[in-house]
Amino acid sequence: MQWSDEAIILGIRRHGESSVIAEVMTPGHGRHLGLVRSGRSRTMQPVLQPGNSVEVSWRARLDEHLGEFRVEPLQLRAASLIETATSVYGIQALGALLRLLPERDPHPHLYEALAVIVDHLQDPADAGELFVRFELAVLNDLGFGLDLSRCGATGARSELVYVSPKSGRAICREAGAPYADRMLALPDFLSGGSRAADHESLAAAFRLTAYFLNRHVYEPRGVDAASARDGFVHATLKALKSASSAA
């Protein structure tokens, strides 16, 4: 059994004296693990860092085996990803989200989204918005997608300012007003509005996705959300607040 694909490194762990087991995200083969012989060598260590884009060739005697990776560098961005807290926490949090999905299950749109996000992790506003959209996409692929396109009560497509915590559907201002204290806020940038993401709207967006991830994924599985997500959210909102104050 063998295949080749482009990939983004999610993480590695030591294996034996000189090898590592690499975890990658690929467009055609999903999240995949493989042994990299001499992966701890001076040549390979800089390549096998989270966030780097590589070409992987996987080979195993049987499909269910761990198999081995041969890895060639494509774009080494890991050095820049350690320069800011948003990028350090961001790449860890993205990997944790992808681990919610079954191993070897292809999600090409998530791979494409990941490739975009890793190049924007140092820009807090872009990174925050892209991360929230990534969480929504993961929820959707797990079968818990939110419907933010129209009001779940009236069918209206305008003035969508709430999300029902029960149905996961958008609710317009008029229909949701009597129950506003029980609703989740829907930021303008997630409802097709023209306002760019800022500190306030991103904070609301992070609360929105956290609620549904906890309800549908973490609590049923009996696990906690990755601490890296909290780190990313804190770093992103702090950076946006500082930028706003400076302006």
UniProtKB/Swiss-Prot annotation:
It comes from the Bacteria. Coiled coil: none annotated. GO terms for cellular component: bacterial nucleoid. GO terms for biological process: DNA recombination; double-strand break repair. InterPro entries: ARFGAP/RecO, DNA_rep/recomb_RecO_N, NA-bd_OB-fold, RecO, RecO_C. Keywords: DNA damage, DNA recombination, DNA repair. It holds the Pfam family RecO_N. Involved in DNA repair and RecF pathway recombination. Belongs to the RecO family. This is DNA repair protein RecO. It comes from Rhizobium meliloti (strain 1021) (Ensifer meliloti). The gene is recO.
